[in-house]
Amino acid sequence: MTKERMTIDYENDGDFEYDKNKYKTITTRIKSIEPSEGWLEPSGSVGHINTIPEAGDVHVDEHEDRGSSIDDDSRTYLLYFTETRRKLENRHVQLIAISGVIGTALFVAIGKALYRGGPASLLLAFALWCVPILCITVSTAEMVCFFPVSSPFLRLATKCVDDSLAVMASWNFWFLECVQIPFEIVSVNTIIHYWRDDYSAGIPLAVQVVLYLLISICAVKYYGEMEFWLASFKIILALGLFTFTFITMLGGNPEHDRYGFRNYGESPFKKYFPDGNDVGKSSGYFQGFLACLIQASFTIAGGEYISMLAGEVKRPRKVLPKAFKQVFVRLTFLFLGSCLCVGIVCSPNDPDLTAAINEARPGAGSSPYVIAMNNLKIRILPDIVNIALITAAFSAGNAYTYCSSRTFYGMALDGYAPKIFTRCNRHGVPIYSVAISLVWALVSLLQLNSNSAVVLNWLINLITASQLINFVVLCIVYLFFRRAYHVQQDSLPKLPFRSWGQPYTAIIGLVSCSAMILIQGYTVFFPKLWNTQDFLFSYLMVFINIGIYVGYKFIWKRGKDHFKNPHEIDFSKELTEIENHEIESSFEKFQYYSKA
């Protein structure tokens, strides 16, 4: 094989040119293969193809000549796509990232924290938790903007730390994203219960899974457009609820009640005793605040959702730095704005809220907004809000389907999952990874034998632990990445995003999340509240992740998996490919290897 290119004529799809230096495997029927200046040898052997400009990485398995020749007849060769496409614009990135964070927790589950801690504790706890999230976000932004590939922080764990941490982090993050799919499916079911419950919980499950699958197998640009509009709708919902709060607190309601900040004055800080024993105890206020802080650690997320889009973003080193900055500001505004508003519209001592929490009532009836609307005799608006909440939950589940499938795809690329999961369809969608991620939706069937609210609580505990572990991993990976970059910075391109206060910023995030992992299930240790099931849902992921790390490092690798030498870490292959893409997209600010 003496030349670099050949042309393949697809049946019904025109001609595509493949660059030998970039492309790896697809399965399709080829109408004809036409040599370009001797790319194919006379024997007719088929060589390796490495990328399709509009379709992602492909591979053609090499077949030696066995007396056959290539002619114009249609023949089938085993080829399959193994790379996603860069089709997402800045607006897609920002809205998809916001969509992955904002679900029903911000509008419904927040009522439990309000009831336990009071409005002031709720607002202060969320504001406080935004500090470590900011530290983690800027640390993530620095390494992801420098290395914008599929599953970047997981791939950097392999490259900069060791394989054992990468394996543990990959499986934990995939589990985190997958388990949130049934969480949102159950949330939709609980919201529907606001109107009626005389139906099988399997119906909304089936409908959502089919819709998630149909959306996920489309080209990523169509997924981006759909999620852009769904996320826009969620932002409109949040802003609409802010407007509702402002108007009604000034008397714009059927009761003409100018309630203002009455609920803040009534019980700004509320005592909470998990075991019900409040005799002679003054720790109730602290435990109320702690309950709000634990809720914040579940609800607030940040840069990891942007990072999962990095491998499919156009001009990533131009788009991602802006996205990280803008998304954090917008999410902080939405989180803190929601905490302020629920404390204004609903009292933590409201009888309906108290009954909803104590009786574990399913549905949006436990949403402080819906309770406030009913108290003010606003009849139609609760139904509208509930419809909007269903859309919000569906959109969040859609985003988790995307993130989980791309995570598993990245794991397969690194060899931590079977290679079959690297296969993509012609649109660059990792279809097998989508399928295995959606299998987790079946977990939502647990609600057939238990109260939906109970199942939601189980999932919340699992998600909280996994999310905190993921934050710890992000900080560890960043510290190792920073060490490698500073050792090699004279031979590497500039950082597109430079965070401040490092390494102390990352250390703050690391310590905060490590402490919260230990705290988040503390109530299970009260003598009256010990429950093996609750303990497992709170701390099982900690033991599983430790087991994966230790097992892989000392059993699978027999202790030979050592920390990477920062002087030997090679970023050049991935960065060269990113440079080539950005040059084709007329963005040349961070050129380095091409100039060299």
Swiss-Prot record:
<feature type="topological domain" description="Cytoplasmic">
    <location>
        <begin position="1"/>
        <end position="94"/>
    </location>
</feature>
<feature type="transmembrane region" description="Helical">
    <location>
        <begin position="428"/>
        <end position="448"/>
    </location>
</feature>
<dbReference type="InterPro" id="IPR004840">
    <property type="entry name" value="Amino_acid_permease_CS"/>
</dbReference>
<feature type="topological domain" description="Cytoplasmic">
    <location>
        <begin position="481"/>
        <end position="505"/>
    </location>
</feature>
<feature type="topological domain" description="Extracellular">
    <location>
        <begin position="116"/>
        <end position="117"/>
    </location>
</feature>
<dbReference type="InterPro" id="IPR004841">
    <property type="entry name" value="AA-permease/SLC12A_dom"/>
</dbReference>
<feature type="topological domain" description="Extracellular">
    <location>
        <begin position="249"/>
        <end position="288"/>
    </location>
</feature>
<feature type="transmembrane region" description="Helical">
    <location>
        <begin position="228"/>
        <end position="248"/>
    </location>
</feature>
<keyword id="KW-0813">Transport</keyword>
<keyword id="KW-1133">Transmembrane helix</keyword>
<dbReference type="GO" id="GO:0003333">
    <property type="term" value="P:amino acid transmembrane transport"/>
</dbReference>
<feature type="transmembrane region" description="Helical">
    <location>
        <begin position="289"/>
        <end position="309"/>
    </location>
</feature>
<dbReference type="GO" id="GO:0000329">
    <property type="term" value="C:fungal-type vacuole membrane"/>
</dbReference>
<feature type="transmembrane region" description="Helical">
    <location>
        <begin position="166"/>
        <end position="186"/>
    </location>
</feature>
<feature type="topological domain" description="Cytoplasmic">
    <location>
        <begin position="139"/>
        <end position="165"/>
    </location>
</feature>
<dbReference type="GO" id="GO:0016020">
    <property type="term" value="C:membrane"/>
</dbReference>
<feature type="transmembrane region" description="Helical">
    <location>
        <begin position="460"/>
        <end position="480"/>
    </location>
</feature>
<feature type="transmembrane region" description="Helical">
    <location>
        <begin position="506"/>
        <end position="526"/>
    </location>
</feature>
<keyword id="KW-0812">Transmembrane</keyword>
<dbReference type="GO" id="GO:0005783">
    <property type="term" value="C:endoplasmic reticulum"/>
</dbReference>
<feature type="topological domain" description="Cytoplasmic">
    <location>
        <begin position="401"/>
        <end position="427"/>
    </location>
</feature>
<protein>
    <recommendedName>
        <fullName>General amino acid permease AGP2</fullName>
    </recommendedName>
</protein>
<feature type="topological domain" description="Extracellular">
    <location>
        <begin position="187"/>
        <end position="199"/>
    </location>
</feature>
<feature type="transmembrane region" description="Helical">
    <location>
        <begin position="118"/>
        <end position="138"/>
    </location>
</feature>
<feature type="topological domain" description="Extracellular">
    <location>
        <begin position="527"/>
        <end position="534"/>
    </location>
</feature>
<comment type="similarity">
    <text>Belongs to the amino acid-polyamine-organocation (APC) superfamily. YAT (TC 2.A.3.10) family.</text>
</comment>
<feature type="transmembrane region" description="Helical">
    <location>
        <begin position="380"/>
        <end position="400"/>
    </location>
</feature>
<keyword id="KW-0029">Amino-acid transport</keyword>
<feature type="transmembrane region" description="Helical">
    <location>
        <begin position="200"/>
        <end position="220"/>
    </location>
</feature>
<dbReference type="GO" id="GO:0005789">
    <property type="term" value="C:endoplasmic reticulum membrane"/>
</dbReference>
<feature type="topological domain" description="Extracellular">
    <location>
        <begin position="348"/>
        <end position="379"/>
    </location>
</feature>
<comment type="function">
    <text>General amino acid permease with broad substrate specificity. Can also transport carnitine.</text>
</comment>
<dbReference type="Pfam" id="PF00324">
    <property type="entry name" value="AA_permease"/>
</dbReference>
<dbReference type="GO" id="GO:0015171">
    <property type="term" value="F:amino acid transmembrane transporter activity"/>
</dbReference>
<feature type="transmembrane region" description="Helical">
    <location>
        <begin position="95"/>
        <end position="115"/>
    </location>
</feature>
<feature type="topological domain" description="Cytoplasmic">
    <location>
        <begin position="310"/>
        <end position="326"/>
    </location>
</feature>
<feature type="topological domain" description="Cytoplasmic">
    <location>
        <begin position="556"/>
        <end position="596"/>
    </location>
</feature>
<dbReference type="GO" id="GO:1902274">
    <property type="term" value="P:positive regulation of (R)-carnitine transmembrane transport"/>
</dbReference>
<dbReference type="GO" id="GO:0005886">
    <property type="term" value="C:plasma membrane"/>
</dbReference>
<feature type="topological domain" description="Cytoplasmic">
    <location>
        <begin position="221"/>
        <end position="227"/>
    </location>
</feature>
<feature type="topological domain" description="Extracellular">
    <location>
        <begin position="449"/>
        <end position="459"/>
    </location>
</feature>
<feature type="transmembrane region" description="Helical">
    <location>
        <begin position="327"/>
        <end position="347"/>
    </location>
</feature>
